[in-house]
Design a protein with these regions (language model features):
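DEDD superfamily 3′-5′ metal-dependent exonuclease/proofreading module
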Residues: 1-77
Length: 77
């Protein structure tokens, strides 16, 4: 996070390039994880470390209808 508590460009870019490293959706880009999966983590607790921070960020974007903001960051356009 940046000083203002907003995600930096690097974190947003990671959402469209980093794959889920474990679980039911292993190998799926974090930006492509289904909302119900992200919401489950929000209820049960995000894992520690960077993956947890990225999942929490993606859950916030998805929950607030802002996931389309990631489209320009995707490699495929």
């Amino acid at each position: 996070m940046t000083v203002d508590g907003l995600p930096g460009a690097e974190q947003l870019q990671l959402l469209v390039t980093r794959a889920m490293p474990f679980g039911k959706h292993k190998g799926t880009l974090i930006a492509d994880l289904p909302g119900n999966y992200l919401n489950w983590f929000a209820r049960e607790g995000f894992p520690p470390g960077e993956i947890g921070r990225l999942l929490a960020l993606m859950q916030e974007l998805d929950h607030n209808g802002l996931a389309d903001l990631l489209k320009p960051l995707r490699r495929d356009g």
